[in-house]
Amino acid sequence: MSEQYTYAVARIRALEVSLFSDSTIDQLIACQNYDQALQFLEEKGWGDAESSGDAEKILTREEEKTWEVVKDLSIGMEHFDVLSYPKLFHNLKAAVKEVCTGDKNRHIYYEDVRIPGEEMRKIVEDRDFGKLPNSMRIAGEEAYETLLHTGDGQLCDVIIDRAALDAIYQAGKESPDKIIQDYAESTVAVADIKIAVRSQKTAKSTDFMKRAMAECDSLSVSQLSKAALSGMDAICEYLRGTAYAEGAEALAESPSAFERWCDNRIIQTISPEKYHAFTIGPVIAYVIARQNEIKTVRIILSGKQNELPDDSIRERVREMYV
């Protein structure tokens, strides 16, 4: 098994050099305006001839490049399924809403997943939920029936988002790869903390939180939801006794500091893979690092477009892998 990944990891090590460091991100933030930031990215090799001057096309092309690299490594794509779950379940959510509301203009699909937009829409339209992966079938049908009969879009979101978290966690439990196990644990725990924070701000009930949160080993859904009912200080107090104590400090600092911590926690989870040479770990870590890099660049470009001060943009910027 280790020999299988030797070439792949060597290739990834060569590519890691071109990942943006914190200092590169600082240079991007220091660009005087949005156009200069785009130019900076293009000079760094982002996008291609067809995407020139178009931020969305540049970012999309970078996502495509990431998966092109992975496919070139001749590693089974099933190893990366868990990373595509957020997009896959998003497509299910978009399809349910489009079919139930008849609104075809609002819902954007991802095409670079196992079930792209048109195929997902047809499955929902035909109510052929058996064509969905096991982890999506029950949630797809339940969300469809809920939205059709109650018109409750938020409950529809909760049903599908919870199923996505359960699928990620299950993938972690079933994977022989430690990076997937750790990624799944951190992803679900951080999502649960986000749900608790949002629920506290919007005065949601315990029942709502327990329906939205996914069980995981590193947090107690029961204790976290109970803390959320008591207030933000209680959430922070609970988190201080867990592996997510830094999240409590970020939460106390500001909403944007907390959002930043949520993503940074995932990067911290995968960082040890920089020192492994004979497992699939560095390859998966590279994909996650690229996704984080693209998300960070998107945040900076949005800040530049809206003419936010550099300090305000910097507060939102994520930690880099390299």
Question: Where are these predicted regions, by residue range?
Answer:
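N-terminal domain-start signal
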Residues: 1-322
